[in-house]
Amino acid sequence: MILCSIVALALVIERLVSLRGAKVAPDKLLDEVISITRTSLPSSDVVNKLAASSALGQVLAAGVRSVVAEPRLSERALRAVFENAGRVSVHRLERYLNTLGTIATAAPLLGLFGTVVGMIEIFGSQAPTGGSNPAQLAHGISVALYNTAFGLMIAIPALMFYRYFRGRVDGFTVDMEQAAERLVPHLMRFAVKSSA
């Protein structure tokens, strides 16, 4: 259980640092991209800087790159590019969340397991002749129940942070989808219409 608590604490700290709003979806990033692409498509250096800036930047850069690479890109294809880039970004944002959820689920079970083993030991150590001390038995049971309490002490915060981080990722996902939706018509102005 000590290992579970150390891993859970490390994951919580890592996710708190990684899921900051400024690092994932900066507030003015979409407006900056629209401003930069108002008259023409940016150079590859600018697009690379955009992609390196944040998860939202990676998604927006994927759309800009696709229009630069294929000027006859259809709106449907551009939306597919944004969708694929969004999936990759969301997958990165969800990193370690399943591990944190597993710890939240497993910690109380490990505590319960420790309690059961402790109870077996306590009752197994009692004299079969009936000369057992009730106070000693009660003390042994209370010590065994500490395992369950420790499991819950790990599980409750881990579950709360898991839910918090899940909500953050869901919020960032919506933000990225909305930004991509706003950028699609803007980028389609640069797409060359194919003559059929």
Each language-model region and where it sits:
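Hydrophobic alpha-helical transmembrane segments
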Residues: M1-L19, M153
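Small-residue packing motifs within transmembrane alpha-helices
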Residues: M1-I6, L97-I103, A107-L110, G114, ...
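Residue-level signature of catalytic and energy-coupling elements of molecular machines
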Residues: A8-L9, D45, L60, G111, ...
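Predominantly long cytosolic amphipathic alpha-helical stalk/bundle segments
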Residues: V24-F113, V117-G131, Y164-A196
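Short hydrophobic alpha-helical membrane-anchoring segments
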Residues: L11-S18, E121, M160-R163
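Pore-lining and gate-forming transmembrane alpha-helices of multi-pass membrane transport proteins
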Residues: A135-Y162, R166
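Flexible, active-site-adjacent loop/turn segments at secondary-structure boundaries
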Residues: V17, H91, A135
